[in-house]
Structures are given as structure tokens and as C-alpha cells.
Design a protein with these regions (language model features):
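Aromatic "clamp/platform" in nucleotide-sugar-dependent glycosyltransferases that forms part
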Residues: 259
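Membrane-proximal helix-turn-helix segments that form the acceptor-binding/catalytic region
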Residues: 118-139
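Nucleotide-activated donor-binding/catalytic signature segment of Leloir-type glycosyltransferases, i.e.
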Residues: 223-245
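Short hydrophobic beta-strand element within catalytic cores of glycosyltransferases
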Residues: 267, 276-279
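Carbohydrate-associated surface elements
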Residues: 145, 166
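Conserved acidic donor-binding segment of nucleotide-sugar-dependent glycosyltransferases
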Residues: 291-302, 310-316
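Conserved donor-binding/catalytic core segment of Leloir-type glycosyltransferases
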Residues: 140, 173-203
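A short, well-ordered alpha-helix in the C-terminal region of glycosyltransferases
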Residues: 317-331, 340
């Protein structure tokens, strides 16, 4: 098959995150399976194993997308339209099969990023207009929580397939757990990740258990978060793959304080190294952590602090969760994910629905 992805960012973008990783890993594995792959996305773009077409700026790309699509992949078998809040509305201008891929419905995230009038318009477009325009298009959701959110905004459940991301093979295979309490969080430093909440909780935990908190990742909130951070917090920014896996292997626990997610890729990555996670019982995170098996889900900030202290002081419990995290994470491998995606794509092409 000839499969074209269309999304608003490439991995070369400074703000690239889980969505961009998902597309790239899928694309590379589909290439290995013999499919032809292209990616249409907003700039900046980088060189990839597959062809990448620059759609333009953050918002101008939505106007350019139909024109560039028609010049490049108009006759391709399938367009995978990646929904990132503001839709491309591809069913209005493409005449061949479409598959919509959605990581999460943004809901309250609109208000975190935009002023009230724009946030209301964005939320209305995603929740009311998008389901209407895409009413015949099949969807792929990356978790049960995302599928539930799609149903809530009017997408038929029988049009939704669930496909969770995989993880790469670790660049480090030997785990050398830290002898002192070491805790890690990893991800983009943006409002919905709630790193400010994590730093508040850390002040309460540190006074009881000691140790260090390492914050991996970058983003627009970094300066303000560094100013907010107390003692024994280290911001390391973006790091290489080998360093990432080394830190996952050394850490006692991964902290994930996001308000919501589509899926927690870093939770599964940490689990690959036998590192359990502690997060909130919210969409996406609850799909990535099996409560009491691969980590712990907290109900509130106070509960998070209490469970964090409990896990830091209870080595047998950490070891039990470590083994559970390793076993659960072993279920998610990119080659298997790509095979399942190829089957879903084939069904979409065969149906002829657009």
C-alpha cells in the first residue's frame, strides 16, 4: 500500500512529542514491511527514511494542506489524517480512503493554551464540527480512554479501532538501580503536564525520604518551573536515547502528573527498564499504568504524596511493581503495532470509505 500521514508537526520541531514519535515509528516499520510511506506536516521538517512534505506554518498549513496533498499523494491508497485538535477536514477535499488517527480529545487543554474566545471556538470545532465532517471515516484511537472521549463527542463506537503505541528496544540493557532515592519525570514542559504540581509534591516528599528528582524534557514552561523548583531538583532538558534509558534504569520511580493523556509512552518506556510509575487516575495515564501491578494511580495531590513516600520506603513493593512494569511493557513493540496498523489500514482501503 501507499500510505500518507498528515499531521501538524515533524520530529524536527522543537515541540515534537508522543504524536510525532508515534507517526515516525509507524512509518519506519511500515517501510520495513514493504509499504510506501510519506508524511505531510507543518514545518520545520527534517530528513527521514520516507518522504516528508512541508505544509507550512502552525496555522497556514491548514490552508495549504489540500493543495500540497493534491500535488503529491492525491492518488495514494490511504491518507492517515492525524487529528491534533484543529482538523484538516480532509473528507471535504479528498476522494480516496481516509483513516483518522487520534491521540486524545483536547477538551480542557484548549483553555490552557488559548484565550477564552479562541479556546471556545477550538473546543466547539473539535467536539461538534469534526465528528460531523468525519461521520463516515474510520478512526484509530490510541487507548480506551481516547475511544471513550470520541464516543462522548459523537463518533460511533463501531468505527473506532484501538491501537496503542509501542516502545523502542532500550539502548541500555543493564539496569544499575541508584543506591539513593532517585525519581524521574519525562516529557514536554507544558501546562497540562502539571510539573508545577510535581514540584510542590516533591517538597513534601523530599523532607521525608531525601534523594533527587530529575526532570527530563524541555518546553515553554522550563524557565518558570526552574524558578519554582526547590532543592535537589535537576532539569536536564532533552537528552539522547542512551542517557534516557540509563536514567530510566537508575530511577526508583517515574512520576507522571499530567492532567490527561492519550497514552503515556514514557510510562511504558520506564517499565521496559523495570521502573514502575506513579501518576493520577486520569484518561490515558490509567490506560498506561495497571494500578497495583505496574505502578500506582493516585486520586489527589495528597494521595500522590502519600503513595510516593510509601513507595520510596517500601523496597519489596517497588520490586513487585518493577517486575509487573517489565512484563506489562513487553506487550508493546513497534513491529507488532505496525502489523496491526497495516491490517487496519488495509480494511480502510478495502472499505473505500472516505
Amino acid at each position: 500500500m501507499r500510505i500518507a500521514f498528515m499531521s501538524w508537526r515533524d520530529l524536527a520541531n522543537d515541540q515534537a512529542g508522543g504524536s510525532e514519535i508515534f507517526i515516525d515509528r509507524l512509518a519506519c516499520n511500515l517501510l520495513d514491511m514493504g509499504h510506501e510511506v510519506a508524511h505531510l506536516c507543518g514545518g520545520p521538517v527534517g530528513e527521514r527514511r520516507y518522504e516528508v512534505f512541508d505544509l507550512g506554518g502552525t496555522f497556514s498549513q491548514y490552508a495549504k494542506a489540500p493543495l500540497i496533498h493534491h500535488r503529491t499523494v492525491r492518488d495514494w491508497d490511504l491518507l492517515v489524517d492525524v487529528e491534533n485538535g484543529l482538523p484538516y477536514f480532509s473528507p471535504l477535499w479528498r476522494r480516496k480512503p481516509i483513516l483518522a488517527l487520534l491521540l486524545h480529545v483536547h477538551t480542557d487543554q484548549w483553555a490552557l493554551r488559548f484565550p477564552a474566545p479562541l479556546a471556545a471556538a477550538g473546543r466547539f470545532t473539535e467536539a461538534k464540527v469534526m465528528p460531523l465532517v468525519y461521520r463516515r471515516v474510520p478512526f484509530v484511537a490510541i487507548s480506551d480512554s481516547t475511544a471513550d472521549s470520541l464516543v462522548d463527542i459523537g463518533v460511533d463506537r463501531d468505527r473506532i479501532r484501538i491501537l496503542s503505541p509501542g516502545v523502542d528496544a532500550p539502548a541500555v540493557t543493564t539496569v544499575q538501580r541508584s543506591t539513593e532515592p532517585l525519581f524521574i519525570c519525562a516529557g514536554r514542559l507544558v501546562p497540562h503536564k502539571r510539573i508545577d504540581l510535581l514540584l510542590r509534591a516533591w517538597e513534601r516528599v523530599r523532607s521525608v525520604v531525601g534523594g533527587r528528582l530529575v526532570v527530563v524534557g524541555d518546553g515553554p514552561e522550563r524557565d518558570s518551573l526552574e524558578a519554582l523548583a526547590g532543592d535537589d531538583v535537576e532539569f536536564v532538558g532533552k537528552i539522547g536515547e542512551q542517557e534516557k534509558w540509563r536514567l530510566f534504569g537508575e530511577a526508583w520511580l517515574l512520576l507522571h502528573t499530567a492532567q490527561h493523556e492519550g497514552w503515556g509512552i514514557v510510562i511504558i518506556e520506564a517499565g521496559t527498564m523495570g521502573t514502575p510509575s506513579l501518576g493520577f487516575d486520569v484518561p490515558g495515564v490509567r490506560d498506561s499504568i495497571v494500578d497495583g501491578v505496574s505502578g500506582i494511580l493516585a486520586d489527589s495531590e495528597d494521595d500522590l504524596v502519600g503513595r510516593w513516600i510509601e513507595l520510596a520506603n517500601d523496597r519489596p513493593l517497588r520490586e513487585k511493581l518493577s517486575e509487573g512494569a517489565r512484563l506489562y511493557s513487553a506487550r508493546f513493540r513497534w513491529d507488532e503495532v505496525a502489523k496491526e496498523f497495516a491490517a487496519i489500514a488495509s480494511d480502510a482501503v478495502g472499505s473505500g470509505i472516505r
